[in-house]
């Protein structure tokens, strides 16, 4: 019985010591705000970079805005010019 109690207490102490050394970590960037905008043209091979530059060229956008974007082709009816959809996230 003594051995069982000592074993349980030692397990609790070891668990407490391990958990007391764990530190909370914040993410480096917080991608909290989403922006979905259509732009003319196709994505091509550098669609992400094109979306980022188009978002930064928007009126009122800060020049030092850090954005992460994905580019996808948008459905358009036959006879209309191609469009791409930029799905972007930025720190708000």
From Swiss-Prot:
Compartments where found: Secreted
Entry-linked PANTHER family: DEFENSIN-LIKE PROTEIN 226-RELATED, DEFENSIN-LIKE PROTEIN 245-RELATED
Family as reported in the entry's similarity comment: Belongs to the DEFL family.
GO BP term, example: killing of cells of another organism
InterPro entries, alphabetized: SCRL
Organism in which the protein naturally occurs: Arabidopsis thaliana (Mouse-ear cress)
Protein name: Defensin-like protein 226
GO cellular component, one term: extracellular region
Keyword tRNA processing annotated: no
Keyword Disulfide bond: yes
Signal peptide interval: 1-27
Protein keywords: Antimicrobial, Disulfide bond, Fungicide, Plant defense, Secreted, Signal
S-S bridge residues: 33-92, 43-71, 51-86, 69-88
């Amino acid at each position: 019985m003594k051995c069982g109690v000592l074993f349980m207490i030692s397990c609790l102490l070891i668990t407490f010591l391990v958990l007391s050394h764990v530190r909370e970590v914040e993410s480096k960037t917080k991608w909290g705000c989403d922006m979905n905008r259509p732009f003319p043209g196709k994505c091509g091979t550098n669609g992400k970079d094109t979306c980022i530059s188009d978002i930064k060229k928007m009126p009122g956008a800060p020049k030092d805005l850090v954005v992460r974007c994905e580019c996808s082709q948008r459905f358009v009816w036959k006879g209309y010019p191609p469009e791409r959809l930029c799905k972007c996230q930025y720190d708000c």
